Amino acid sequence: MYLSLLKSLNRLSPRAWDFVQLTRIDKPIGIYLLLWPTLWAVWIAGKGSPSLNTVFIFVAGVFLMRAAGCVINDFADRKVDGHVKRTEQRPLVSGKVSSREALVLFAVLVSLSFVLVLFTNSTTIWLSFGGLALAACYPFMKRYTYYPQVVLGAAFSWGMPMAFTAETGELPAAAWLLYIANLLWTVGYDTYYAMVDRDDDLKIGVKSTAVLFGDADRVIILSLQGLALGCLALAGSRFELGAFFYMGLLVAAACFAWEFWSTRLRERDACFKAFLHNHWAGLAIFLGIVADYALR
């Protein structure tokens, strides 16, 4: 229904559809991958009963900041996307949206996100500036380092410490275990994503962990996912989570094993499906957290 409504917008206003494509709200996978770990932190911080105010702020913030991240990413890549098969039709490349319009939209989305943060507390407000800096600089990292996925992981995980300070006013040390776990997981799944474009990236000189890891890519991804699960298990013990949480981790581990097997030939479609599949791992962990608190 969600996608049907968006597609009807294309028929009613092709111009509006250009901005839908720029923000990629028609492709919710990025929202899911940002939403689930944010909700892990929200639920754990709230001990299973987070305030509706916190839930609303962080869910809305995920939608807005993911859209903002897509806009600034396409702005940064506007001169190289035309050389990559997957991105050659993006609105900034085709000229359907101008660079100025993209920057204005980015500013609007970031401003709306900041308005949400103003309804939290001073610690969370200060932390939000770190998240903005990471989101803004990530798209440019692939020009200078083979580790842009690490910066993306840092950006995608920044909502987790913010969730703790917003909900409790404090930032326990164990919250950083969640942060590290999500950073490792993000590097893993975004390397699958980068493997889709690796041949094009090698031709145009774009850097990524997929390029850096080479033939060791899948083994390194699986290792990162294993380390992420280890950090989550340790965080679970610190936050006194129980059996349902660990069942969620087992489901996530099964997801990771399937991804490793399905990408054994490194076909583009298989790598992209493995990237998409990580949404289910994140959801499984979230449902494990919810069930663990609800069924005590």
Curated annotation (Swiss-Prot):
Reaction(s) the record says it catalyses: all-trans-octaprenyl diphosphate + 4-hydroxybenzoate = 4-hydroxy-3-(all-trans-octaprenyl)benzoate + diphosphate
Pathways involved: Cofactor biosynthesis; ubiquinone biosynthesis
Principal subcellular localisation of the protein: membrane
Gene Ontology molecular function, alphabetical: 4-hydroxybenzoate polyprenyltransferase activity
Transmembrane segments: 28-48, 52-72, 102-122, 123-140, 146-166, 169-189, 219-239, 241-261, 275-295
GO terms for biological process, alphabetical: ubiquinone biosynthetic process
Key word rRNA processing present: no
Keywords tagged on the record: Cell inner membrane, Cell membrane, Magnesium, Membrane, Transferase, Transmembrane, Transmembrane helix, Ubiquinone biosynthesis
Keyword Transcription appears in the UniProt entry: no
Known EC number: 2.5.1.39
Gene Ontology annotations for the cellular component aspect, listed alphabetically: plasma membrane
Main function: Catalyzes the prenylation of para-hydroxybenzoate (PHB) with an all-trans polyprenyl group. Mediates the second step in the final reaction sequence of ubiquinone-8 (UQ-8) biosynthesis, which is the condensation of the polyisoprenoid side chain with PHB, generating the first membrane-bound Q intermediate 3-octaprenyl-4-hydroxybenzoate.
Similarity annotation: Belongs to the UbiA prenyltransferase family.
Name used for this protein in its record: 4-hydroxybenzoate octaprenyltransferase
Gene assigned in the entry: ubiA
